[in-house]
């Protein structure tokens, strides 16, 4: 069993339907790993019927019977399955989305009374054990909570759920205790490896959910430092020097972009989990946050600050990001095209989020298959190569990369709109959308290959191994 600290350290952003520009709900996350290369695939898991199987985690041995019936769903499993599937994120055929997980850490006080369970539910299993079996975001919270109650939790995890109406965020922080909060429809939320949920209203089950006995657990063990509030973050979370350099600055930067009128400090321990943006948010806004690295501040590792400033805070977009995704459930479109999974391999700063319709029965070979050795015919490796080339001459290549991503974003919107319009005339929507996904993958792969060729050619002129020469020599 790999130590958890080597597994995942992510940034998550959620958007309610009335907070978005088009009525969509959105959940999103950068899946960050300990190593810079941790290959991922994009896959469609088929629906199952009359199954009689037992699930056994390759990561920690969690064992539980599987339901006989399960929905089709998309996922982004690891290339190396030796530590389990780690499917991470996806949308099922009922247009319910899940992203798991945001690693979170409880304090020693609460863990002393409810320690983590070594072979309990962990990140590797969450998507596989919940997404195929839920009809709504709220059902997802309940099913995940029921599994934790029965089998315990091996780790601290934050999980996002969404359907066309609701967005929920659940934090499992000890062996058996958790809470969940519905993101208000007109708000967004950002989480960054730190317990985020704040005050819980136990008289409002429509907007909050929690593990059985959590109030008694807290009061019985004298865990609440406040006499006036029940603040989950302050009871169960951490507030350390590491948090102020690794975690809170990411929330600060996202809120700085989405609410520039509000002045806050990057090391503040009181940044709110939920905010209402100063404008309606688009999928491009979510992409900007996921791609960000303290842009236009002295803390930008690619900027002009001092070396100390550029290394003070951990950025949102990293070379260690393996999979950056946005699960968008759209309203005001036919059910067949509501689910769009924007998937980005490679470093998010330099690479595009590619939109795939999730009502499909297969993914493109360049995303589904993953050769052991690098090849530019594979989407993961292609985008990793692009990121490395762009960063190698960032000043010279930055604008070309920005133009490439902008052109693809424009193309994506046009393609999605055309597909929305065409879907009503399709006898087999799943087959049609599967074909559209192949076209989308091909377009993005070709555009990326073209840019890569352009930058390699231009880069030869930037080599330090050169000299002013006579053109005839």
Swiss-Prot record:
InterPro entries: C69_dipept_A-like, Peptidase_C69. The keyword Membrane does not apply. GO terms for molecular function: cysteine-type exopeptidase activity; dipeptidase activity. Its EC number is 3.4.13.19. GO terms for biological process: proteolysis. It catalyses: an L-aminoacyl-L-amino acid + H2O = 2 an L-alpha-amino acid. Pfam families: Peptidase_C69. The active site is at 10. It is an enzyme of class 3 (hydrolase). Keywords: Dipeptidase, Hydrolase, Protease. PANTHER family: LD30995P, SECERNIN. Belongs to the peptidase C69 family. This is Probable dipeptidase. It comes from Latilactobacillus sakei (Lactobacillus sakei).
């Amino acid at each position: 069993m790999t130590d958890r600290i080597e597994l995942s350290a992510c940034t998550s952003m959620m958007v309610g339907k009335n907070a978005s520009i088009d009525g969509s709900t959105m959940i999103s996350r950068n899946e960050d790993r300990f190593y810079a290369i941790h290959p991922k695939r994009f896959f469609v898991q088929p629906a199952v019927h009359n199954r009689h199987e037992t699930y056994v985690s390759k990561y920690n041995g969690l064992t539980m019977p599987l339901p006989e019936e399960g929905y089709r769903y998309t996922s982004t499993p690891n290339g190396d399955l030796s530590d389990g599937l780690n499917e991470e994120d996806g949308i099922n055929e009922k247009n319910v989305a899940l992203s798991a997980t945001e690693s979170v850490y409880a304090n020693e006080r609460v863990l002393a009374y409810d320690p983590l369970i070594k072979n309990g539910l962990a990140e590797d299993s969450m998507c596989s054990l919940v997404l195929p079996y839920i009809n709504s975001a709220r059902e997802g919270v309940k099913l995940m909570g029921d599994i934790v109650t029965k089998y315990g939790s091996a780790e601290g995890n934050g999980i996002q759920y969404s359907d066309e109406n609701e967005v929920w965020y659940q934090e499992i922080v000890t062996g058996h205790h958790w809470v969940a909060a519905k993101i208000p429809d007109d708000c967004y939320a950002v989480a960054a490896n730190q317990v985020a949920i704040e005050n819980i209203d136990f008289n409002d089950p429509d907007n909050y959910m929690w593990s059985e006995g959590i109030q008694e657990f807290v009061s019985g063990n004298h865990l609440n430092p406040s006499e006036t509030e029940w603040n989950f973050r302050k009871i169960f979370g951490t507030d350390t020097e590491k948090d102020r350099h690794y975690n809170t600055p990411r929330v600060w930067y996202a809120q700085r972009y989405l609410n520039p009128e509000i002045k806050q400090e990057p090391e503040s321990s009181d940044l709110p989990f939920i905010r209402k943006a100063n404008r309606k948010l688009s999928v491009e806004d979510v992409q900007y946050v996921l791609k960000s690295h303290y842009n236009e501040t002295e803390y930008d590792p690619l900027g002009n600050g001092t070396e100390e400033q550029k290394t003070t805070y951990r950025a949102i977009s990293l070379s260690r990001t393996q999979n950056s995704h946005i699960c968008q459930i759209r309203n005001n479109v036919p059910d067949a095209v509501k689910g769009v999974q924007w998937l980005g391999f490679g470093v998010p700063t330099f690479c595009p989020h590619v939109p795939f319709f999730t009502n499909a029965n297969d993914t493109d070979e360049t995303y589904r298959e993953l050769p052991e050795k690098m090849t530019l015919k594979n989407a993961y490796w292609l985008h990793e190569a692009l990121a490395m080339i762009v960063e190698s001459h960032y000043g010279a290549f930055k604008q070309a990369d920005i133009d490439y991503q902008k052109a693809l974003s424009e193309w994506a919107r046009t393609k999605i709109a055309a597909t929305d319009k065409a879907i009503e005339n399709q006898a087999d929507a799943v087959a049609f959308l599967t074909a559209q996904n192949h076209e989308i993958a091909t377009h993005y792969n070709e555009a990326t290959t073209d840019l890569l060729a352009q930058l390699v050619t231009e880069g030869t002129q930037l080599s330090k191994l050169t000299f002013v020469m006579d053109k005839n020599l």
